[in-house]
């Protein structure tokens, strides 16, 4: 995805998906392709938040005002100029028996999302631009900036519609306040809408829902033998002025 970092521009909306297709063709077969954008949203400009909330003594990043989930139909084999663009609060239309690729992108400033679809299984096939061996999972945990592609097989019996879930991890924030943590949309099997399938509510916050260390690249690339070792200790915390910073070996950036 593309985004601007100057004064937190991407948190204010300067961000968009950017899909690069393999010249030799996709690593897996599927029938259709959607991009799913997950994000948090602040009503104040990010520059104001940095100055008045984060970069002050004992400051912290405030709780978002809302979460966002929206879709783009990035249809397999078509150029970008033919794409219809993003659609917020849309439904995701499936046809029975087809296999769909969903490209999940977390464009948040601070929020981790837990994504699943009731009544459907998923297989991770790509992580951060790297094709991986099929990894079955019922939930995809997407950190800030991460990208995953999953294959979802449509049901053979189109008798019900199903709920799409994107839970915002509450451990990211302090006081949640009025923030709605569970975003939902609708996976449909018909133009007129149908009875909803059973909704599966999950308590996901603070839990490890998938083991990304088990993802295996589909095309392995060997590592060179190192001749020098560099140790970096990465942490976040308060500097000497009690301002929040991330640091390498206790040097803040």
PLM regions with names:
Residues 32-99, 105-108, 228, 235-237, ...:
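Acidic-aromatic/histidine active-site loop/patch
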Residues 26-28, 121-131:
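Short aromatic-acidic-glycine turn motif
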Residues 85-87, 133-136:
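Short alpha-helix capping/helix-loop boundary micro-motifs
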Residues 8, 105-108, 154-156:
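Non-cytosolic beta-sheet module surface loops
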Residues 26, 90-92, 102-105, 113, ...:
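Beta-strand elements of modular eukaryotic interaction domains
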Residues 12-47, 135-253:
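Extended terminal and domain-junction accessory segments
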Residues 1-5:
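General structural concept
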Residues 106-123:
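Short acidic, flexible loop segments centered on an aromatic residue
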